[in-house]
Design a protein with these regions (language model features):
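Long, low-complexity N-terminal extensions
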Residues: 1-201
Length: 201
């Protein structure tokens, strides 16, 4: 008797803009062909200017975010300074690598704004860290990345980037059964994080 392996679906993406960073993930939580939830949250605030967005098992995402947030709070308390985006991504990479024999089944994008400006890092389940200007992870990423590559510009404003995010999600949701139900956005600037939502037509 064959046993089918089900992987959770998702589309998650991030873009660096001239005045900040946007992280976004759609809300559908699916497992194989079954939609478990239509309101799953896959974007997470880590600090006042740093966030993360994930694709994969929601339980793994949640525990990883709790762990990272706790370590960052300890770091901020002990050093009396805020952790940067790169150091937050490296901390998360270290936690992922520690679990490489039994990895968290999640692909993660960490982004935010610090003294170096806006930045974005992509992490795989084993802790590899890649910095980029835009990224997409999850089952719908192959579709979304095509839109990002054709529409992304280095000097985009937040408002222009929101339109690119909407276009990428519309394309991904039209073809990927694991993605849908609208999206949650984290918009990060030097002034803080704003949360918004996006509805698909």
């Amino acid at each position: 008797m064959s046993q089918e392996v089900f992987m959770p679906g998702a589309t998650t993406l991030g873009l660096v803009c001239k005045d900040g960073v946007i992280l976004a993930s759609e809300r559908r939580v699916s497992y194989g062909y079954f939609v478990m939830s239509k309101s799953g949250k896959k974007v997470f605030k880590i600090t006042d200017t740093i966030g993360a967005a994930c694709a994969g098992l929601v339980a793994d995402m949640q525990i990883l975010m709790r762990e990272v947030s706790a370590y960052i709070r300890i770091y901020n308390y002990e050093t009396r300074r805020d952790a940067g985006v790169k150091s937050t991504a490296k901390l998360m990479a270290s936690l992922l690598f520690q679990r490489r024999m039994f990895p968290y089944l999640t692909q993660t994008i960490v982004a935010g704004v610090d003294s170096s400006g806006p930045s974005l890092y992509v992490l795989d389940p084993l802790g590899s860290v890649l910095d980029d200007k835009y990224a997409s992870v999850g089952t719908g990423s192959e579709i979304a990345i095509g839109v990002l590559e054709s529409e992304y510009k280095d000097d985009m404003s937040i408002e222009e980037a929101k339109k690119v995010v909407a276009d990428a999600f519309k394309s991904a949701v039209a073809r990927d059964v694991g993605s849908g139900e609208g999206a949650d956005l984290l918009i990060m600037t030097k002034d803080g994080i704003k949360e918004e939502s996006l509805k698909f037509a």
